From Swiss-Prot:
It comes from Zea mays (Maize). Pfam families: Ribosomal_L16. The lineage of its organism: Eukaryota, Viridiplantae, Streptophyta, Embryophyta, Tracheophyta. One of its GO terms (cellular component) is cytosolic large ribosomal subunit. CDD domains: Ribosomal_L16_L10e. This is Large ribosomal subunit protein uL16. Keywords: Ribonucleoprotein, Ribosomal protein. InterPro entries: Ribosomal_uL16, Ribosomal_uL16_CS_euk_arc, Ribosomal_uL16_dom, Ribosomal_uL16_euk_arch, Ribosomal_uL16_sf.
Length: 220
């Protein structure tokens, strides 16, 4: 018996059912890698960011997430270069899908109980996605902005329902806008922290501040 099509599980109808000690025998999700490309590049390397945003409330299978990751990574590697981007999958397939297998042979009514005790057994996993939730994000340099948008446009065909490609106003994957990031950096208040950045606060105990400085150090 083959895999049941994901269109049968597209709508969110029930409560979340994650893998646990009560829900055993769950197959591993197809997607195992969520960060692709130059994920170790600092926050200053890739200022541009674009998102693929879901426009419907639905279930997205782990197979669809893996297919979208592959096609987006392949296009960005071919067009922009393998060292010119960082792709991140922003949703995780924690919800367990179940199937109640039914026999279709002759005399099946003698062998099974139909819809009696029809809870079903785990078949696969999916991600529960809400309206406005980000599915994929790509950060890169400004000269590769068109390539990043095209890569996400191709990844849209791997998902059901509707999605939108939205250019972020933030600096990379951080929570700061471009103007604020450059302002804080010129003031010396930004401390790089991998793909994100920390903002030094201007409050705290006075004895921890260095003479002539208004902001605390990163270790304070």
């Amino acid at each position: 018996m083959g895999r049941r099509p994901a269109r049968c599980y597209r709508q969110i109808k029930n409560k979340p059912c994650p893998k646990s000690r009560y829900c055993r025998g769950v197959p591993d999700p197809k997607i195992r890698i969520y960060d692709v490309g130059m994920k170790r590049k600092g926050v200053d390397e890739f200022p541009y960011c674009v998102h693929l945003v879901s426009w419907e409330r639905e279930n997205v299978s782990s197979e669809a997430l893996e297919a979208a990751r592959i096609v987006c990574n392949k296009y960005m590697t071919k067009s922009a270069g393998k060292d010119a981007f960082h792709l991140r999958v922003r949703v995780h397939p924690f919800h367990v899908l179940r199937i109640n297998k039914m026999l279709s042979c002759a005399g099946a009514d003698r062998l099974q109980t139909g819809m009696r005790g029809a809870f079903g057994k785990p078949q696969g996993t999916c991600a529960r996605v809400d309206i406005g939730q980000v599915l994929l994000s790509v950060r890169c340099k400004d000269n590769n902005a068109a390539h990043a948008s095209e890569a996400l446009r191709r990844a849209k065909f791997k998902f059901p329902a509707r999605q939108k490609i939205i250019e972020s106003r933030k600096w990379g994957f951080t929570k700061f806008s471009r103007a604020d990031y450059l302002k804080y950096k010129s003031e010396g208040r930004i401390v790089p922290d991998g793909v994100n950045a920390k903002l030094l606060a201007n409050h705290g105990r006075l004895e921890k501040r260095a003479p002539g400085k208004a902001f605390l150090d990163a270790v304070a």
